């Protein structure tokens, strides 16, 4: 079977996903080791029997709801190709808002930045790609996730980012200009209404107690001990949590509190500045 016919067949099997043609091309790229642009321009290429069988196996996995990123073990974030696994959340485009906000507040060429709950390292590595002089630390309490983050840093050859184990601030011994975090913020009640593909991701990185606010409050409460005077805390949160998150920033004496929307127009990131010493 040639690529063109296989894509047509695959689109029918994946008719329930948002972009079946795009995902079919990604799977072809993964199996044939050709770029997606090459596949698009060379649709008469014949698949081997081995490739055909493997592609059908992958299509079956995708039809059951498994995210394409886990199938091809890769996800693009901030134009970086990142390895992902079942131990890491899949980076979302909306999290790039967190990176953009951090970039807008970094004033020093030698800034120190902490990424709490780094997962595959997406936020830390995006920031590391901007300025090699910045000192960036990413922490996580999952050793398996940290292994993926280190693989990504090595693959990208970034020398200005370090990943190590810490349960939030437990093993942090220094202060930072910027602290960023995409923590668990989904409540146990909410999770049941999500699409089924979310259940392939590590629930410990998604669900938080106290209606999704437990980890957020923990970070806001304790981060002031790890920020320099004038430092910024930036947190991603649920689209209906802005008011409560802003309240927590005020409760723990942050200033210049602002919230920002994601690409879909939903409240997604809140930031605050430390003024007290």
Curated annotation (Swiss-Prot):
Its EC number is 2.1.1.297. Keywords: Methyltransferase, S-adenosyl-L-methionine, Transferase. One of its GO terms (biological process) is methylation. Substrate binds at residues 182-185. S-adenosyl-L-methionine binds at residues 117-121, 140, 168, 182. It comes from the Bacteria. It holds the Pfam family PrmC_N. Gene3D superfamilies: DNA helicase RuvA subunit, C-terminal domain, Vaccinia Virus protein VP39. GO terms for molecular function: nucleic acid binding; protein-(glutamine-N5) methyltransferase activity; protein-glutamine N-methyltransferase activity. It is an enzyme of class 2 (transferase). It catalyses: L-glutaminyl-[peptide chain release factor] + S-adenosyl-L-methionine = N(5)-methyl-L-glutaminyl-[peptide chain release factor] + S-adenosyl-L-homocysteine + H(+). Methylates the class 1 translation termination release factors RF1/PrfA and RF2/PrfB on the glutamine residue of the universally conserved GGQ motif. Belongs to the protein N5-glutamine methyltransferase family. PrmC subfamily. This is Release factor glutamine methyltransferase. It comes from Buchnera aphidicola subsp. Acyrthosiphon pisum (strain APS). The lineage of its organism: Bacteria, Pseudomonadati, Pseudomonadota, Gammaproteobacteria, Enterobacterales. The gene is prmC.
């Amino acid at each position: 079977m040639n690529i063109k016919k296989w894509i047509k067949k695959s689109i029918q099997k994946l008719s329930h996903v948002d972009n079946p043609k795009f995902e079919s091309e990604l799977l072809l790229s993964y199996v044939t080791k050709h770029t997606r642009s090459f596949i698009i321009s060379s649709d008469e290429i014949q698949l081997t029997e081995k490739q055909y069988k493997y592609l059908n196996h992958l299509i079956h996995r995708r039809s059951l709801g498994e995210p394409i990123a886990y199938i091809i073990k890769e996800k693009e974030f901030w134009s970086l190709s990142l390895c992902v696994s079942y131990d890491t959340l899949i980076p979302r485009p909306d999290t790039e808002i967190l990176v953009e906000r951090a970039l807008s507040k970094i004033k020093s060429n030698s800034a120190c930045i902490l990424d709490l709950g780094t997962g595959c390292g997406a936020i830390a590595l995006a920031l590391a790609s901007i300025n090699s002089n910045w000192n960036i630390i990413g922490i996580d309490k999952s050793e398996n996730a940290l292994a993926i983050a280190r693989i990504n840093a090595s693959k990208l050859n970034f020398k200005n980012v370090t990943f190590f184990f810490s349960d939030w601030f437990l093993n942090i011994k220094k202060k930072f200009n910027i602290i960023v975090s995409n923590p668990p913020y989904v409540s146990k009640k909410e999770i049941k209404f999500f699409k089924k593909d979310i259940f392939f991701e590590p629930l410990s990185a998604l669900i938080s107690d106290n209606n999704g606010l437990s980890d957020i409050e923990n970070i806001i409460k304790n981060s002031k001990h790890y920020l320099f005077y004038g430092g910024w805390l930036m947190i991603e949160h649920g689209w209906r949590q802005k008011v409560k998150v802003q309240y927590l920033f005020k409760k723990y004496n942050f200033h210049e509190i602002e919230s920002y929307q994601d690409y879909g127009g939903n409240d997604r990131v809140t930031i605050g500045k430390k003024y007290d010493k």
